């Protein structure tokens, strides 16, 4: 089918996520045709370096025949198996075991979902069940962080703190609370790490006391705030927050949907600070985006409370496609690839990526470069001293994304003029160098725009 026919069919029928429906109708879809390694090809034959791994998820890179073969073998042998009725499949059982073996601390129990949003949703249900089983049903208040992202399901989007996910949906709910982001570049206390940690601890204490310590169920945090603009907290921040939650007896949920599976270097970002959460959510890199799957990791003590609380009764939470054998078979092969060289390559490529992006720091539009491993951001400003963001009237996200695309690069351009990077771990030196060169070209072209020049005057 010709690309223009697909464009019309898309315009008429396919609803795209987090998009202006009328805006998309006017623009039309860009049809992707194929991909290999870190390169994608569109329907016109244009090749682009995927600097964002799809949607932070194709960590292993595109076109691994061994992943395709693992899926095909499982489809031929057992394409579906429910995990209801005490049934199971070998891939799902082995995957749960392999993940538990590699998870921080005593996160020895794994519940499989279809992705990140329903993984977060599942934790909310499990947290509520936990506190009811402990005889503390009043603990029904949840805290997360401004500019955080915890999915786009009804309750998860309420924990998310991005306006686009709230407008028109009647969320967040009254039981969902926020504290300020540790955002070093734009923090009221400045960029000193110790001051930021102290401010966050103070804010969390105030919020807990305001709600009532006996009423707070759980606190949610990403090791790096992804969709909020790749905000990297100072070293020690997450560990300090986790310890405060422990002091108050509040469950701590680490959302590693983006950071998990080598994105920041190790398999899980929590291990960089020896953090053992009560729950950990993952998805994206779990299957490298080849098939849908997410996972909730649950600590022993949480599992025991839930299991003992239910006794002979069923814990009434489940999905038709939980522990899907094909997804599990894919995840097992992806995990093998990570440990057979991709994690190491990602660490090397991440160092090259950060060095390359830091080389752009002298560009007139670059206010800050930040990141860890293969997860990074460049924040654009019109005044470096005042940290003035690009004017909203310039539509920086749309403009920069389109321009990068024309230059053969896919990145995430956030509305506030932040460029997000999350390339596949398989990137070669030439892939990384192309990302940097095409970013610089995109910045130079944007600097030449009359309205941007005027804003900088």
Language-model regions: role of each:
Residues 1-457:
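Conserved N-terminal phosphate-binding loop of PLP-dependent enzymes in the Aspartate aminotransferase
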């Amino acid at each position: 089918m010709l690309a223009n026919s697909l464009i019309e069919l898309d315009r008429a029928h396919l609803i795209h996520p987090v998009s202006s429906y009328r805006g998309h109708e006017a623009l039309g879809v860009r049809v992707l045709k194929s991909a290999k390694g870190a390169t994608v090809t569109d329907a016109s034959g244009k090749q682009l370096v995927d600097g964002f791994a799809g949607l932070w998820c194709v960590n292993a890179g595109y076109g691994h025949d061994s992943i395709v073969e693992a899926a095909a073998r499982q489809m031929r042998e057992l394409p579906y198996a429910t995990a209801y009725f005490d049934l199971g499949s070998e891939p799902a059982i082995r995957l749960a075991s392999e993940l538990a073996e590699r998870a921080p601390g005593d996160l020895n129990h794994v519940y499989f979902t279809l992705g990140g949003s329903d993984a977060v949703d599942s934790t909310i249900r499990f947290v509520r069940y936990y506190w009811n089983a402990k005889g503390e049903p009043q603990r029904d208040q949840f805290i997360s962080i401004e500019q955080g992202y915890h999915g786009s399901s009804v309750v998860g989007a309420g924990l998310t703190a991005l306006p686009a996910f709230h407008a028109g949906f009647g969320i967040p709910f009254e039981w969902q609370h926020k504290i300020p982001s540790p955002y070093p570049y734009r923090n009221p206390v400045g960029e000193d790490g110790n001051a930021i940690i102290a401010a966050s601890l103070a804010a969390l204490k105030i919020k807990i006391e305001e709600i009532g310590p006996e009423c707070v169920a759980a606190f949610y945090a990403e090791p790096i705030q992804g969709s909020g603009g790749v905000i990297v907290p100072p070293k020690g921040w997450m560990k300090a927050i986790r310890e405060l939650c422990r002091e108050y007896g509040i469950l701590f949920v680490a959302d590693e949907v983006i950071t998990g599976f080598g994105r920041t270097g190790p398999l899980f970002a929590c291990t960089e600070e020896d953090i053992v959460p009560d729950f950990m959510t993952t998805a994206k890199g779990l299957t490298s985006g080849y098939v849908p799957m997410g996972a909730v990791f649950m600590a022993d003590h949480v599992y025991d409370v839930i299991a003992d609380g239910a006794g002979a009764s069923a814990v009434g939470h489940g999905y038709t496609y939980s522990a899907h054998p094909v997804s599990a078979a894919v995840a097992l092969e992806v995990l093998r690839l990570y440990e057979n060289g991709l994690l190491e390559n990602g660490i090397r490529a991440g160092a090259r990526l950060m060095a390359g992006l830091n080389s752009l720091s002298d560009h007139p539009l670059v206010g800050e470069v930040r990141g860890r491993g293969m997860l990074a951001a460049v924040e654009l400003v019109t005044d470096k001293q005042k940290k003035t963001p690009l004017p909203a009237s310039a539509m920086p996200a749309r403009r920069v994304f389109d321009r990068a695309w024309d230059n053969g690069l896919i990145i995430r351009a956030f509305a506030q003029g932040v460029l997000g990077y999350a390339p596949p771990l398989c990137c070669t030196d030439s892939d990384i160098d192309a990302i940097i060169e095409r970013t610089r070209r995109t910045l130079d072209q944007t600097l030449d725009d009359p309205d941007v020049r005027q804003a900088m005057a």
